[in-house]
């Protein structure tokens, strides 16, 4: 999947924080395909990449404002409330995104990997890691800066 692109009427962008994780997953699948072209589809990374595409194309871009994507107070309150998340991969993976209904834009902010699986209370928990990233401003909290950083990479 290349970014930016238009899916279900939404302009879909990837912030560098998401793009880095996504590119690493794509590279892992390409390596698996090169090593074992007959069976790479059975590997966990290949299945995960397929689920990521499905989540983006069939869930996020269909209705980014769905109540199912609200995170409650998992990222704290205040400025982080504008972030949404989708759960997948047996509930262990999270993809965080922001959207603007007015602009019809969705920005994929970050997706956890096998090192940051959802594990409540752990330092490597997806919500804990993403909260720390937001505190450091990468990705940024405000829409204008988020949009600018995203557009600069495309």
UniProtKB/Swiss-Prot annotation:
One of its GO terms (cellular component) is toxin-antitoxin complex. One of its GO terms (biological process) is regulation of DNA-templated transcription. One of its GO terms (molecular function) is RNA nuclease activity. The keyword Transcription applies. Toxic component of a type II toxin-antitoxin (TA) system. Has RNase activity in vitro. Overexpression leads to growth arrest after 30 minutes; these effects are overcome by concomitant expression of antitoxin SohA (PrlF). Massive overexpression is toxic. Unlike most other characterized TA systems degrades rRNA, and co-folding of the both TA proteins is necessary in vitro for inhibition of the RNase activity. It is not known if it has any sequence-specificity. Acts as a transcription factor. The YhaV/PrlF complex binds the prlF-yhaV operon, probably negatively regulating its expression. Homohexamer; forms a complex with PrlF (SohA) with stoichiometry PrlF(2)-YhaV(4), possibly as a YhaV(2)-PrlF(2)-YhaV(2) complex like the MazFE complex. This complex is seen to dimerize in solution. This is Ribonuclease toxin YhaV. It comes from Escherichia coli (strain K12).
């Amino acid at each position: 999947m290349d970014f930016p692109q238009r899916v279900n009427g939404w302009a879909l962008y990837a912030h560098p924080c998401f793009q880095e994780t996504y590119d690493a997953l794509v590279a892992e699948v390409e390596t698996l395909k090169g090593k074992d072209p007959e069976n790479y589809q059975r590997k966990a990374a290949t299945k995960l990449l397929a689920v990521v595409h499905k989540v983006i194309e069939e869930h996020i871009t269909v209705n980014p404002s769905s109540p199912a994507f609200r995170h409650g107070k998992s990222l704290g309150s205040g400025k982080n409330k504008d972030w949404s998340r989708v759960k997948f991969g047996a509930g262990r993976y999270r993809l965080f995104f922001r959207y603007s209904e007015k602009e019809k834009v969705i920005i994929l902010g970050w997706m956890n990997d096998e090192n940051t699986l959802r594990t409540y209370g752990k330092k490597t928990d997806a919500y804990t890691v993403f909260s720390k990233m937001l505190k450091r401003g990468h990705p940024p909290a405000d829409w204008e800066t988020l949009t600018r950083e995203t557009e600069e990479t495309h």
